[in-house]
From Swiss-Prot:
Lineage of source species: Eukaryota, Metazoa, Chordata, Craniata, Vertebrata
Family: Belongs to the SPT20 family.
Organism: Homo sapiens
Chain positions covered by the region annotation Disordered: 246-273, 369-524, 560-601, 631-669, 720-757
Superkingdom of source: Eukaryota
UniProt feature, compositional bias: Low complexity: 469-509, 568-582, 636-650
Coiled-coil stretches noted in the UniProt entry, renumbered to this chain: none
GO CC annotation terms, alphabetical: SAGA complex
Annotated GO MF terms: transcription coregulator activity
Biased composition (Polar residues): 423-440
The name this protein goes by in its record: Transcription factor SPT20 homolog-like 1
GO biological process, one term: regulation of transcription by RNA polymerase II
One Pfam family linked to the record: Spt20_SEP
Cystine pairs: none
Length: 823
């Protein structure tokens, strides 16, 4: 196909070259006259015969229409192009040869000019040309003479450049002619009109070439290209840039004067204006210049009263009810304790959270320092996630909250011998016993302690424990399986525990206590804490106890129980087994041979103690321990000791012993100290305050814990005490974790529910004070609050004297990240 097209193009070039050099002569019929096209062809043949052989010379076979008009004096249509904004005009020739102007148009109306460029007869001129006195049609075409006065306007007389254009009819003009011819008053049918139109087309159309060769089309395209090569759209745009419609707006803008606001005054005009204006220049002396605003008199009357409410502007604080913020279930927490602050004392409000992970029975805690609370704060409730298994937390001096709690333990209780660490966790681990509300039972099930003796291999499957909530509904808790709750503990020598005692410059750390936090979905007013220490012994003996307490107790009466004095190893009596804090390695271990027991007592309200000395408020750590008496060590040691009391036998026990969940052994080893006499706490529940009488022996507090201070003692009424003789109690270190509890009133009907074993935690606000302060006197503040408390103790085997066993805490204070306990 490409080859045929190339051959057709070559043939078209040859045809054009032959036609330009030697066009053939035509033969016409002698009867008919020649048409306009035939006349033009004859002139072309004549001019080609005169063509010189030298191609460099000029050709004469051009401008054929001008030569035809000069030869035959054919009438034509005259179009004048005037310079400037004069526009153009159309003139018709009269019979005497003069021209009369018919139409004058500006250059902006380019419709007629576009028809002239296309060499087409405009349909709008049909009526004008038909009414002309001279027939200007030649074979249906019109010859137009264009006189251009724009380039020779400066000549006198003005000259012009002339060229002729042949306007050929189009289908529009033929339709217009048919319409004009049928207006003669006769009736023309549609067929007659179509026949007339066909005759006009045949008469005015050029001869057709019906040769199927492609060379014919290529020849016609080449001739049209040579004729319209300078009449392209880009060339038209370039020429219109210098046409009058484009130049006229520019000239009009240059001729118009600018508006007065935009006129620029010259420098001479400015100087002329300044000539008549006097200039007053006053230069003041140095030091005598006074500002204008200072020189003005200012007499302001001081108002006697000011309405602050009208002048003050209040800003609405963003609340949880704002639709733009996500609405979270908020829980209002307020400080139930009324501390009096002194000058220079920095108040710290800590809200510890005690919880237990799934992979380890050792308790996890999180202590966060809060800002100074001047008003009630709203806080979103803590939501546990069952998939979160965080490692246990260890209190330490890395944060202010841990340091405040450590100083509170140091100033009130004995000094720590084996310090432990606490690392803060950003995510709250899930509670082991997630409480959910169920139907209220008639008699709630009690909770019992399960223990096993090392070496015998006796294990019991942990039963499902149900704890009654304060609202009267049952909450179920899942205990640990035996393989997760117990792990072997490494014994340690007493010398290693004694060498681990920190100096006075070191800050003691807070021990851990095992607890479980309830699920926030149920939101019971009472928080549930579980203490389940497990001790593994090499040699079996009597007197050692493991404490496992959980469950609520309803009542309003404080309980107290006595204990037998513990003698130091040097006094001849067998020393109790110590548990070293440095040996606390894992969070759980198998329990020794322990006999479970349950103690139920009625307590109307818990007792909350606060310490106030003449020097000011001193930090005091409140603990809630089992119902057995608990004694802390003397002032010369820095370790916390918890002495488990003898098993209490309560005649009103209504439930038999059942196997309970295993716990972990918690505690730090300390040296035994003799307690020759028993001291009782004297409490008046009806009063808001009661004095403490300083005594030279340590104090015993059975319900909420024991806080021993050098040279001090407190005493309980004998009516509230329950005594049970035992050979010798062991020494266990208490590791407390604190958990906030909201104050809620309980109805009297709920206070008569059966009692269960439970340890209640309270929110403590600690004041940061120096560590080494000798406390001589204490003032005890007792607050009554309807909560649920219970304690319990069971007797286990006491180890051989001189043997210390325990679990070692692997995490050290210098480590930045806590090591998760072994499962």
């Amino acid at each position: 196909m490409d080859r045929d097209l190339e051959q057709a193009l070559d043939r078209a070039e040859n045809i054009i070259e032959i036609a330009q050099q030697r066009p053939p002569r035509r033969r016409y019929s002698p009867r008919a006259g020649k048409t306009l096209q035939e006349k033009l062809y004859d002139i072309y043949v004549e001019e080609c015969g005169k063509e010189p052989e030298d191609p460099q010379e000029l050709r004469s076979n051009v401008n054929l229409l001008e030569k035809l008009v000069r030869r035959e004096s054919l009438p034509c249509l005259l179009v004048n192009l005037y310079p400037g904004n004069q526009g153009y005009s159309v003139m018709l020739q009269r019979e005497d040869g003069s021209f009369a102007e018919t139409i004058r148009l500006p250059y902006e109306e380019r419709a007629l000019l576009d028809y002239l460029d296309a060499e087409e007869l405009p349909p709008a001129l049909g009526d004008v040309l038909d009414k002309a006195s001279v027939n200007i049609f030649h074979s249906g075409c019109v010859i137009v003479e264009v006189r251009d006065y724009r380039q020779s306007s400066n000549m006198q007389p003005p000259g012009y450049q002339s060229r002729h254009i042949l306007l050929r009819p189009t289908m529009q003009t033929l339709a217009h002619d048919v319409k004009m011819m049928t207006r003669d008053g006769q009736k023309w049918s549609q067929e007659d009109k179509l026949q007339l139109e066909s005759q006009l087309i045949l008469a005015t159309a050029e001869p057709l070439c019906l040769d199927p060769s492609v060379a014919v089309a290529c020849t016609a395209n080449r001739l049209l290209y040579n004729k319209q090569k300078m009449n392209t759209d880009p060339m038209k745009r370039c020429l219109q840039r210098y046409s009058w419609p484009s130049v006229k707006p520019q000239q009009e803008q240059s001729d118009c004067p600018p508006p007065p606001e935009l006129r620029v005054s010259t420098s001479g005009q400015k100087e002329e204006r300044k000539v008549g204006q006097p200039c007053e220049l006053n230069i003041a002396k140095a030091g005598s210049c006074v500002d204008t605003w200072k020189g003005r008199p200012c007499d302001l009357a001081v108002p006697s009263e000011v309405d602050v409410e009208k002048l003050a502007k209040g800003y609405q604080s963003v609340t949880a009810a704002d639709p733009q913020l996500p609405v979270w279930p908020a829980q209002e927490v307020e400080d139930p304790f009324g501390f009096a602050l002194e000058a220079g004392c920095q108040a710290w409000d800590t809200k510890p959270s005690i919880m237990q992970s799934f992979n380890d029975p050792l308790l996890c805690g999180k202590i966060r320092p809060r800002k100074k609370a001047r008003q009630k704060s709203q806080k979103s409730p803590w939501q546990p996630f069952p998939d979160d298994h965080s490692a246990c937390l260890r209190p330490g001096s890395e944060t202010d909250a841990g340091r405040a709690v450590s100083q509170a333990q140091e100033s009130v209780q004995s000094k720590v011998k084996g310090p432990g660490k606490m690392s803060h966790s950003s995510s709250g681990p899930a509670s082991v016993s997630q409480l959910s509300s169920w139907k209220t039972p008639e008699q709630p099930d009690p909770v019992w302690v399960q223990s096993s003796v090392s070496g015998k291999g006796e294990k019991h499957p942990p039963p499902r424990t149900q704890l009654p909530s304060s609202s009267g509904k049952i909450s179920s808790g899942n205990s640990f399986p035996p393989q997760q709750a117990g792990s072997p503990l490494k014994p340690a020598a007493p010398a290693a525990a004694a060498s681990a005692a920190p100096s006075h410059s070191q800050k003691p750390s807070v021990p851990l206590i095992q607890a479980s936090r309830p699920c926030p979905a149920a939101q019971p007013p009472t928080k549930f804490i579980k203490i389940a220490p497990a001790i593994q012994l090499r040699t079996g003996s009597t007197g050692l106890k493991a404490i496992n307490v959980e469950g609520p107790v309803q009542g309003a009466q404080a309980l107290g129980s006595s204990f037998k004095p513990v003698q130091a190893p040097g006094s001849g009596a067998p020393a109790p087994a110590g548990i070293s804090g440095s040996d606390l390695q894992s969070s759980g271990g198998p329990l020794p041979d322990a006999r479970p027991g349950a103690v139920q007592a009625s307590s109307p309200a818990p007792l909350q103690f606060f310490l106030n000395t003449p020097e000011g408020l001193r930090p005091l750590t409140l603990l809630q321990v089992p119902q057995g008496s608990a004694v802390l060590t003397g002032p010369q040691q820095q370790s916390h000791q918890l002495v488990s009391l003898q098993q209490l036998q309560q005649p009103t026990a209504a439930h038999p012993p059942q196997p309970g969940p295993q716990g972990s052994a918690l505690g730090l080893s300390t040296q035994g100290q003799a307690f020759p006499a028993q001291q009782l706490l004297k409490v008046n529940p009806t009063r808001a305050r009661s004095g403490l009488q300083p005594q030279p022996q340590p104090a015993v507090l059975s319900l909420l814990g024991s806080a021993q201070v050098p040279q001090q003692g407190v005493q309980l009424p004998s009516v509230l005490r329950q005594q049970q003789p035992q050979p010798q109690p062991p020494k266990l270190q208490l590791q407390p974790q604190w958990q906030p509890k909201p104050r809620q009133e309980q109805p009297q009907s709920q206070q008569q529910q059966p009692q269960h074993i439970q340890l209640q935690t309270q929110q403590l606000r600690v004041l940061q004070q120096p560590q080494h302060i000798q406390l001589q006197t204490q003032q005890l503040r007792v607050l009554q609050q309807p909560v649920f408390l219970a304690t319990g103790a069971v007797q286990i085997v006491q180890p051989h004297p001189g043997v210390q066993v325990g679990s070692q805490l692997v995490d050290q204070r210098k480590e930045g990240k806590p090591t998760p306990p072994a499962p």
